[in-house]
Amino acid sequence: MKKIMLIASAMSALSLPFSASAIELGDEGGLECGPYAKVGVVGGMITGVESTRLDPADAGGKKQLPLTTSMPFGGTLAAGMTIAPGFRAELGVMYLANVKAEVESGKTGSDADIRSGADSPMPQRYKLTPPQPTIMPISIADRDLGVDIPNVPQGGANHLGDNLGANDIRRADDRITWLKNYAGVDYMVPDPNNPQARIVNPVLLNIPQGPPNANPRQAMQPCSILNHDHWRHLVVGITAMSNANKPSVSPIKVLSEKIVQIYRDVKPFARVAGIEVPSDPLPNSASVEQIQNKMQELNDILDEIRDSFDGCIGGNAFANQIQLNFRIPQAQQQGQGQQQQQAQATAQEAAAAAAVRVLNNNDQIIKLYKDLVKLKRHAGIKKAMEELAAQDGGCNGGGDNKKKRGASEDSDAGGASKGGKGKETKETEFDLSMIVGQVKLYADLFTTESFSIYAGLGAGLAYTSGKIDGVDIKANTGMVASGALGVAINAAEGVYVDIEGSYMHSFSKIEEKYSINPLMASFGVRYNF
């Protein structure tokens, strides 16, 4: 019994220093475990974001305009737990407002003086190139339309074979046009072995034809485009290839980007003529009616610009009226079926794809771009633009008064002011707000009785909403990660003041354009329960 008492006394004596040490740690650095709450304010600056607008002074057409970013600010609210001495886990929410950026527009001045000489052609200030063609997925309605394309009637019979005669090519013109417009495939291509000759596109020769074959098919098979059965197999094969290689971007977004690019290219000329060019893109969920209205709006603005400059330069520049003649596919207009919502989405995509095909290699748009290039390089363009900005008519002294609204305000787009000094205006490129929720882990690096230095890592989700180019965007949710370094000051018993600097990285782009990566400083008060 005495032995047991001695052992218990020894163990009790050994435990006393350990208990005292634990109490001292709690008194020194506030290292006691337990829950806490934190509230604070945050502010900072935006990094890693670039404008989507090209610099008009860049002849290569690749340099973006500089963005002037604002200083976002907001508040934080968090709850956490000190899980071990010097280590804590935290769940926090941060709200950031004023996530805003502006871009310079209408820039004139010394750079405008470079092109102010009337005796020399105006140097290229920006590259004018129509949007590149984009091949869209072929829908079922497009496929059926292609299958039912007949041959053009002929007066006499010609051979059906690999090498079509001139008359046969004329008979297959509608089918060849379908291949080009819907699949982006040229029927005849230059012969690699003889550049002077042309052969049937090898892509068409690789599409299987005929009934099932037990033996492996030949790599290259004859292509008889005038043969109806052969043509049916050709259309089905081309459709399968199109859908297998279809882009991940929706047809509505492709159409919107093309229209925005065209508006951006013609805007300097439109401003000189006093024509207002919209800046709002198509919403991602645009209806068939919205797509049709947008195409009509594009048609009207391009033709108004053309009409404004008709007669400014020689030849037949700006002489031909622009008529895009966009029509909603009839099969999609009906939009009836058991799955109405899915049918509606399919109709929207089909309408957008049809609109993209109208813009692909559009001869009227290409002609307008060429005429604008001539206008831009004309030796007397500066004087002509100044007259357009000052008069209530076209460059010939007449015209509609409506085309001159605001011309005096926008004359900086055509040349420098009389004093040689220009002005810069700023346009808001985006104005957003963010709600960020993160789980963070903190560890103390250095601890004293009065303060501690800590570092932390976090990960979570960011919810972003607001406007881009003045248009409300669809809310974006994406992954974020952050790193922080801070100082915690022991202000009172259980109360700490956290002064922290952090960086947050976004893994996704808003509207596939902007990656918001802010540097932030925060000031918070933490209370340990």
From Swiss-Prot:
Gene3D superfamilies: 2.40.160.20. The lineage of its organism: Bacteria, Pseudomonadati, Pseudomonadota, Alphaproteobacteria, Rickettsiales. It comes from the Bacteria. Residues 1-22 form the signal peptide. NCBIfam families: Orientia_TSA56. It is a multi-pass membrane protein. Residues 106-116 have a biased composition (Basic and acidic residues). The chain crosses the membrane at residues 67-87, 477-492. This is 56 kDa type-specific antigen. The keyword DNA-binding does not apply. Pfam families: TSA. Residues 106-134, 392-424 are annotated as: Disordered. It comes from Orientia tsutsugamushi (Rickettsia tsutsugamushi). Keywords: Cell membrane, Membrane, Signal, Transmembrane, Transmembrane helix, Virulence. Coiled coil: none annotated. May be an adherent factor for rickettsial adsorption to the host-cell surface and a determinant of virulence of individual rickettsial strain. It is the major outer membrane protein.
